[in-house]
Every structure is written in structure tokens, then in C-alpha cells.
Amino acid sequence: MPRAKKTWGEKMKAKPPHHVILAKDFAGIPKGSKLHISSPEEIAAELKTIPLGSIMSIQAFRRRLAEKNKCDATCPVSTSIFLRIVAEYTWEEFNSSSSIQGLAPFWRVVESSSPMAKKLNFDSSWIDLQRELEKQNS
């Protein structure tokens, strides 16, 4: 019998962040590096620390997480997966409350033209709208 599909809210409660030492090169990160594996909750919390109206690349965001956690790098694969979870969860929460107050501002890191944005279950132009609104209000 197939398992019930997890909701975005359930996916937000993934394993806690942890670190690994790479046994071999991975995604451009050399063997022996200390790699931070984040979590959706940590990513959501970190997104909230990016100032209103600011935009940051995913690469810069990963470097920031790595530095904060005293690691050489943050896993690019899990970061992308977790960012998508945060974005989808945020979208659901926005639709249930019609307010972005208190939500994780993933649009400060996710570009509307990015491959990740194309996978989201909503129109990526909403990302541009949020960026424009923040620009006007900052």
C-alpha cells in the first residue's frame, strides 16, 4: 500500500542540520571539506535575516550558512531541495492568510527565471512582484 504524500508543512520538519566530512569531491567541493547539510527550518529562519529589499544569490546564501556553521561549504543539492520546500510552504501559508507577515522571504534568494522557480506550484512572476513591493517599501 503506498504511503500518503507528505504535506509541505510536514516536509518543513525534516532532520535537523548536521555536518559531514566529504570522503570524495562532490559538486565542486573538494574531498576533506566540512559540508553543512541544512534543513528547511534553518533555511526559513536564515531567509528571515536577509534585510527587506535585499537580494542574494543562492551561492552567497549557501556560503553564509556555511560560515555561520563553521563549515567549508553548504550542500548545494539539499539547499535547493529545502529552498523549494520553504517556497511551497510559504506559498500555502500566504494563500491561507493573504499576508506575507512572518513568512520566509524565499524571493530574496530564488530568481523568478531560475530552474527552481519553474518547478514551483505557482507562477514565478509572484517572486518578481514580491521583490518589487519590497523595493518600494525599503
Regions found by a protein language model. Name each.
Residues R3-K6, K11, K15-S138:
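Nucleic acid-binding interface residues in structured DNA/RNA-binding domains
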